[in-house]
Amino acid sequence: MTRLLHIQCSPRLRRSASLEIAHSFIQSYRQQRPDTEVTTLDLWSLDLPELDQTAMDAKYAQLAGQPLGNAEQRAWARLQALAEPLHQADLLVLSIPLWNFSIPYKLKHFIDLVSHQGILFSFDPENSLQGLLRNKTAVAAYARGLDFSSRSSTPAPAFDFQKPYIEAWLNFIGIANQHSLIVEKTILGPDIDQASRQAAAEQAQALAQQLAARQY
């Protein structure tokens, strides 16, 4: 059985291109693997705590190897609980719209809450940083309204801080096996939008069949 975690990052729901492509992937994957267990984290309905002084005190106490007070223990336990679905998953699917050339603030908030030493990575002077989510696969469905090709006014090397950031974060926490699904030009008219979504959905279905053939 594959445990699939879908992190949903768009509030647009039925109108979301990233969510549409992620659903195409998940549906096709489940057709190949009917026993797949799917868990969804909708970041817009999830109660994300603030990374406040107590949580930061807990973080630095952990780094220093110092005991945590009661309030710090509660704050740290909440961060661990938020990260637990990532540890449990075999396959991580993220549906990510591009906002102002980067990722939605809800996703950045989530990443900041769970990306800590002892939760998603380890650190020691001899081995440096080691991601704790090894032997997992990630599929990211990226949606962009504009054209990010090299000939456009927003070429990806200069304007795309969405995909490179997610790839770096996934590598940092130990997920080297990554796949990208990209749908662009979604605000350039209904015909272009529909064609872009259709092409990305076909790529998603093909990738799902490819990954479903593997054993987890």
Curated annotation (Swiss-Prot):
Keywords, comma-separated and alphabetical: Flavoprotein, FMN, NAD, Oxidoreductase
Positions with a binding annotation for FMN: 10, 16-18
Family that this chain belongs to: Belongs to the azoreductase type 1 family.
Required cofactor names: FMN
Domain of life according to the entry: Bacteria
HAMAP family membership: Azoreductase_type1 (MF_01216)
Entries under Gene3D superfamilies matching the protein: 3.40.50.360
Enzyme class at the top of the EC tree: oxidoreductase
Signal sequence, start to end: none
InterPro entries linked: Flavodoxin_fold (IPR003680), Flavoprotein-like_sf (IPR029039), FMN-dep_NADH:Q_OxRdtase_AzoR1 (IPR050104), NADH:quinone_OxRdtase_FMN_depd (IPR023048)
Function: Quinone reductase that provides resistance to thiol-specific stress caused by electrophilic quinones.
Record field: catalytic activity: 2 a quinone + NADH + H(+) = 2 a 1,4-benzosemiquinone + NAD(+); N,N-dimethyl-1,4-phenylenediamine + anthranilate + 2 NAD(+) = 2-(4-dimethylaminophenyl)diazenylbenzoate + 2 NADH + 2 H(+)
Protein name: FMN-dependent NADH:quinone oxidoreductase 3
Record-linked SUPFAM superfamilies: Flavoproteins (SSF52218)
Summary of subunit composition and partner proteins: Homodimer.
MF GO annotations: electron transfer activity; FMN binding; oxidoreductase activity, acting on NAD(P)H as acceptor; oxidoreductase activity, acting on NAD(P)H, quinone or similar compound as acceptor
Cofactor binding description: Binds 1 FMN per subunit.
Keyword Plastid: no
Enzyme Commission (EC) number: 1.6.5.-, 1.7.1.17
One Pfam family it belongs to: Flavodoxin_2
